[in-house]
Every structure is written in C-alpha cells, then in structure tokens.
C-alpha cells in the first residue's frame, strides 16, 4: 500500500543535514585539527581516489630525500642525475555506520527533544569520537579490538573494517622507545624489564626531540621555517609532567606572568623546546587492561603509549562528507535516522631514511612508552 509522509526530507534537506552532521563530527574530533592536504600536515588527508590499472585507490605518496652529493665545478652533470625515490602507500577504505530509532509517536509527544537535532549531535559526536579512537590506535600500532584504555572492546565491529589489519603492525625498529631513569631507551615498554619504566620528565621531552631529529623524523614547518613536533600523552601523564620540578621551573620563569601562565590556566597543550605537548583521553594506556596484559615483562605495570609525531605521521582517506538517511517503520510510527562515512587510516612506512636507507621504517611517528 502506498503511503504519504509529509515529514520526509527532500534530497536538498538531506544533504544539508548530512553536512551539518559532518560539521559536528569534525568539530568534536580531536585528530581533525591536525589534518591537512599537504605533506606538511601531521595527518595527511587524501580526499580523492587515484586511478590505476588496479582500479581507483586512495594513495599516499612519500618522497625520500636525495642521497647523492651532486656534481662539483664544471664536471659533467648530464648522465649523473639522481632519480627521486617515491613510495606509494595505499590506504584501504571501508564504511562505518550507526543509527538512532525513535520508540514511536507517543514517546515523541512526551519529549520536548527534537529528534533530528539530537540525532545529529549524538551521531556526530559518536563519529568524531570513533575517528579519534581509530586514529590513535593506528598511530600506536595497536589493534581495533582494544579500547584506548587497554580493555577489550565489547564488539568486534571496528576490527572488521578493511583497514583495521594495518593498525596492528608493530612499531618499526627505530620508531619505538621507552623511558627509564637512564633516559630514552630503544624498544617498547611491553618488552621492558619489570620496574624500569619511569614517568615523563622535562629532561625526557628535550631528549625525545633530539632523538626524533637524529632519526630523521621530519618536523612540521611553522612560521619562520622552524620545525615543531607534536607529543600526545594521557591526562594522567600530563599531570605527572606538570609535577616535575624542572618543568614547573621552566614554565614558571619562561611563561607569562599572572593568570595567563599555563600553570594557572590549566591548558591542555603547552610548548616545550619546539615540542607541542597535548593531553588527550584517547592516548593509549593500560588502566583498563587485564592483569598480565599491561606493560613490562610481567604485564603488571601501568603505562601509557605517548606519540611523538612529525609530518605525515598518519594518512587518512577522507572520501566525501558523511551521509544522512531517514526511514520509517511500523506504519510511519517509528522514525529512524542513520549516518555513515567512507574513510580509512594508515600509519605510513617507507624505505629511504638517510639513517637506514634500506630499512622499512614508520615515516612520521615514534611510540614512547612510559610509566603512569
């Protein structure tokens, strides 16, 4: 039987609601503020597919630095040119969806809440939050079967996405360190001996920046040509850093006086020695992990996995805005709203790092395991 629904949206209205939802998702997404189209972005956004003999794919291109010394004086340059080495990395894409469904007309009458507006806000927040979780798990080389507090997810939905397997690839040899009393040490905190992990100090921040530069992690060019790095840690990790005596002294004396000083403002980000330090709840930690699955040899040490990020630390296939669909059930008594997005994440790797030209390395991120 044909039905007429005067509340149904036109295609133009649906497009407007979809754009509104994606605006909410982008505004609430933490990782989105670090995304850009160019090679100078921490998260490089790929917004179009590249056609090839294998079909249309989301391709992230990494270009290695030149290795040769060129030609001196009037020596012949022709025939001695150096070929640029470019590495194409394909980002797998998939679709993630969610929906709300109203109980019925009477439930709607009893509520003053606008169903469309609430769905837009709640679904938009959900989408932004899931993008954040997957982005940080990908950069941390951890599977989508985990929550960012180390506990196991209630469902395996995220781990079935086509790009999920790329997240569960261990950090490469020169891109994983942990903090000990002796300083920055190679290897992950999960493989460290019991009792050696330490919390982050001001000295560690300075040494981590030097470690990134020594290992050719390309920083993000700022105004004046200076390179900066982003360092992400948990709120608890930031609290420990703010209690470090050297950190307190430097912020107190180098910062502005009065209530605008970061010690008093309670800011979520602070600049230290060319490193912008951010606290974020979805930086991975082990507080929710079962005993034996935490850090160090016995798996019983609480820790966090900080992320030291330069340019192109993460690739994101961002193919169009989210979409918005509405449907009605039970003779139009129960309206439902669904949203979805096609996207993908990948922590890029390449060969050609001047320190180890033949070794496959994570391109722009170092994992830093510390105690909590």
Each language-model region and where it sits:
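Glycine-rich, histidine-containing beta strand-loop boundary motifs that form or position
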Residues: 62, 104, 119
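Core alpha/beta structural scaffold of self-assembling particle/tube/pore-forming proteins
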Residues: 2-22, 109-372
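N-terminal "assembly arms/tails" that initiate or stabilize quaternary assembly
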Residues: 1-93, 353, 358-372
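Extended, low-charge hydrophobic alpha-helical regions
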Residues: 92-110
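Short, solvent-exposed loop/turn segments at the edges of secondary structure
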Residues: 55, 93-95, 226, 332
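Structural recognition of the beta-strand scaffold that forms the well-ordered cores
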Residues: 58-61, 101, 230-232
């Amino acid at each position: 039987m044909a039905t007429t629904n005067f509340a149904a949206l036109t295609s133009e209205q649906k497009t407007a609601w979809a754009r509104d939802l994606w605006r909410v998702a982008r505004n609430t997404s933490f990782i989105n503020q670090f995304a850009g189209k160019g090679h100078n972005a921490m998260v490089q956004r790929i917004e179009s597919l590249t056609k090839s003999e294998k079909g249309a794919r989301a391709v992230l291109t990494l270009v290695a630095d030149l290795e040769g010394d060129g030609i001196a004086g009037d020596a012949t340059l022709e025939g001695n040119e150096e070929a640029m080495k470019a590495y194409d990395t394909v980002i797998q894409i998939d679709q993630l969806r969610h929906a709300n469904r109203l109980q019925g007309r009477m439930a709607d009458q009893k509520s003053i809440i606008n169903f469309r507006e609430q769905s837009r806000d709640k679904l938009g927040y959900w989408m932004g939050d899931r993008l954040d979780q997957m982005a940080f798990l990908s950069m941390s080389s951890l599977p989508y079967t985990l929550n960012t507090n180390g506990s196991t997810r209630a469902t395996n939905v995220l781990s079935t996405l086509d790009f999920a397997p790329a997240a569960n690839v261990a950090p490469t040899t020169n891109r994983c360190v942990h903090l000990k009393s002796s300083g920055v040490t190679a290897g992950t905190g999960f493989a460290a001996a019991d009792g050696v992990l330490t919390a982050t100090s001001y000295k560690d921040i300075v040494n981590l920046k030097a470690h990134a530069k020594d290992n050719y992690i390309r920083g993000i060019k700022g105004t004046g040509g200076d390179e900066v790095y982003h360092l992400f840690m948990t709120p608890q990790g930031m609290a420990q850093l703010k209690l470090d005596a050297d950190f307190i002294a430097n912020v107190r004396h180098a910062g502005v006086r009065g209530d605008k000083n970061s010690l008093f403002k309670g800011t979520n980000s602070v600049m230290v020695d060319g490193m912008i330090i951010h606290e974020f709840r979805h930086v991975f930690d082990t507080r929710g992990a079962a005993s034996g699955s935490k850090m160090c040899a016995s798996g019983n040490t609480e820790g966090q996995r900080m992320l030291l990020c330069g340019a192109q630390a993460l690739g994101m296939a961002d193919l169009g805005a989210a979409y918005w669909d509405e449907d009605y059930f039970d003779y139009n008594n129960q309206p439902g709203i669904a949203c979805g997005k096609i996207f993908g994440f990948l922590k890029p790797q390449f060969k050609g790092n001047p320190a180890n030209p033949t070794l496959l390395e994570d391109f722009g991120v170092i994992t830093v395991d510390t105690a909590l």
